Each structure stands twice: as C-alpha cells, then as structure tokens.
C-alpha cells in the first residue's frame, strides 16, 4: 500500500478543514492517544487506551485510570511523588 501522507500524518483525514494550527494540536493529541505505553505492572509495551481515562494492558489484563489522552498526567506524577515522600517521612 502506498504512503498517503508525508507531513500531516494522522490528521490527513481532516483534509484542508479546520486550519493548520488546530490540526497540529489535534495531531499531537491523537498521536499520544493512540500510542502504546509501558505497563507499570508487567513492564511490557502493551498499555493502550480503551476509553476516556481508562487504560488497559493487553498482556497482563490490568485496567487502570489515567489521563484522557495520555497514560500518565503531570498531576498524577506530582501526587505520586508527594505520596511517596509522605510515606518515607512516616517510616523514618
């Protein structure tokens, strides 16, 4: 099958509609949304988005809540580090 798009990639389906800057923004979101992520439980590159905020691993069948378009958000990273720091303070 021939390659259809060179620059536009996944947003080629929108054609010339909606403007270039909006298509670039949507392209970033759709690439992160459709890509596979590393599973925290089994370590394989098998975590895929099932629905908005629901991510499932194809390998170990774990289902976790995450971001709408990205598996791990910046807010989740901040909360995780704060919880880890509080846990370490409590133990010591």
UniProtKB/Swiss-Prot annotation:
Report the GO molecular function annotations.
structural constituent of ribosome; zinc ion binding
Q: Which GO terms describe its biological process?
A: translation
Pfam families linked: Ribosomal_L37ae
* Ranges that cross the membrane: none
The answer, when asked if Protein biosynthesis is one of the entry's keywords, is no
Keyword annotations from UniProtKB, A to Z: Metal-binding, Ribonucleoprotein, Ribosomal protein, Zinc, Zinc-finger
Mapped zinc finger ranges (C4-type): 39-60
One GO location term (cellular component): ribosome
Q: Does the keyword field hold Cell wall biogenesis/degradation?
A: no
**Which superkingdom is the protein from?**
Eukaryota
User: Mind telling me which Gene3D superfamilies this protein's record contains?
Assistant: 2.20.25.30
Protein family membership: Belongs to the eukaryotic ribosomal protein eL43 family.
Q: Which NCBIfam families match?
A: eL43_euk_arch, PRK03976.1
Q: What is this protein called?
A: Large ribosomal subunit protein eL43
Species? Cryptochiton stelleri
């Amino acid at each position: 099958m021939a390659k259809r798009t060179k620059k536009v990639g996944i947003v080629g389906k929108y054609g010339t509609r909606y403007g270039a800057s909006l298509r670039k923004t949507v392209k970033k979101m759709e690439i992160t949304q459709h890509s596979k992520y590393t599973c925290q439980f089994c370590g394989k590159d098998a975590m895929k988005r099932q629905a908005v905020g629901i991510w499932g691993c194809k390998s170990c069948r774990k289902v976790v809540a995450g971001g709408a378009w990205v598996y791990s958000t910046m807010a989740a990273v901040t909360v995780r580090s704060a919880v880890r720091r509080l846990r370490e303070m409590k133990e010591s």
